[in-house]
Amino acid sequence: MAAPMEVVVCTDAAAQLWSCVVWELHSGANLLTYRGGQAGPRGLALLNGEYLLAAQQGKNYICAWELQRKDQLQQKIMCPGPVTCLTTAPNGLYVLAGIAESIYLWEVCTGNLLVILSRHYQDVSCLKFTGDGSHFVSAGKDCLALAWSLCSVLQADPSRILAPRHVWSQHTLPITDLHCGFGGPMARVATASLDQTVKLWAISSGDLLLSVLFDMGITSVTMDLAEHHIFCGGSDGSIFQVDLCSWPGLREHSFQPEQNTGKVFKGHRNQVTCLSVSTDGSVLLSGSHDESVRLWDVKSKQCLRTVTLKGPVTNAAIILAPPSMLNPEFRPSLPLPHFNKHLLGAEHGDEAQGGGLRLQLGLHLQGKEPSYLERLEQLQAVLSSYLEKNMLGSQMLPARVFDLEDEVRSLRKINRDLFDFSTRIITRPSK
């Protein structure tokens, strides 16, 4: 079986020829292009391996394409305001969007707007789910990074104030990027800020594990899958590689480029906007405001390929191509529903029923659920059938007992005859 193909998905601010382009990582061959608008920074996401979502820069809607119907915009998801960042749950059940200082959470199978979280004081700049979808992290221009438990956010108690699991407030300038590692509730989160630091946090405890100081503002951050290295993109175009195993026990560290010349990638002429690492950790992808996307060999720090775009790069990531992306005959399992702009129950002025959420926890549970009266009728039918069988069985029981007793008497007679016959044979005198 062939290994999954790694592809690069990227967008730029100009969007003259296309909104999004997909090309093969190692050969650079163009595979797909999508048209329909300009995707904003950190506004690109795959939904369940079937749809591509792009938050339009400065506009109040999200474009959605089927992965194979690239020339036809499937849907525009209208939002209450311009979307500043976007992400989707790994299982494809939820969509998160940052709109101004609030976080909007939609359920994909129904399109219901479940929750609006308002704990940031300025615009939300980044949103990321953990690998298992149990938590998500938000960061904003208010210098705060918040770790949320999805289970707590979806709780249905209206009297309980929704609060993040952790509030990380050690940054002193706006947070520009964040990265969630693997491990679910044990994952580590890296945050980058204009205060010239990158900080590493533990979701499980909320502790600050490491703070690295640079000599410039950091505009992007990522880690390899093994989490041996943090890659930090600077405002001048430099990319720094921080080895997490180099300073055991140190909580704070200052990165000096002149002392770490073998840990700096040089080539971009403007700030680095996005970073991504290949699955095996050997290739680093970077996008910049200098209108170029570069592929780097991590070990040698050499630039392997440069792709020039028509505008500043807003999104660039290395992903494993889902089967639907490479299969021309593939169609989504379910169409996207209409996404509501108002909270569930509030769209029709139904405040009385706003205290609970009806959650469908699977993509294929679309459709009308039976009412309680219908469920009661089904239960009564099952109970009646069970009682009927029991009554019928109780009437046949005496006849069955009589048959078994008769069979036992017959077997006893056969056994006695067999015993008598054997005794006569054994005791017969020999001639």
From Swiss-Prot:
Component of the 5FMC complex, at least composed of PELP1, LAS1L, TEX10, WDR18 and SENP3; the complex interacts with methylated CHTOP and ZNF148. Interacts with NOL9. Component of the PELP1 complex, composed of at least PELP1, TEX10 and WDR18. The complex interacts with pre-60S ribosome particles. Keywords: Cytoplasm, Developmental protein, Nucleus, Repeat, WD repeat. Belongs to the WD repeat IPI3/WDR18 family. It is found in: Nucleus, Nucleolus; Nucleus, Nucleoplasm; Cytoplasm; Dynein axonemal particle. WD repeats lie at residues 36-75, 78-116, 119-158, 170-211, 213-257, 267-306. Its main location: nucleus. The keyword Repeat applies. This is WD repeat-containing protein 18. Signal peptide: none annotated. Functions as a component of the Five Friends of Methylated CHTOP (5FMC) complex; the 5FMC complex is recruited to ZNF148 by methylated CHTOP, leading to desumoylation of ZNF148 and subsequent transactivation of ZNF148 target genes. Component of the PELP1 complex involved in the nucleolar steps of 28S rRNA maturation and the subsequent nucleoplasmic transit of the pre-60S ribosomal subunit. May play a role during development. Transmembrane segments: none annotated. GO terms for cellular component: dynein axonemal particle; nucleolus; nucleoplasm. It comes from the Eukaryota. It holds the Pfam family WD40_alt.
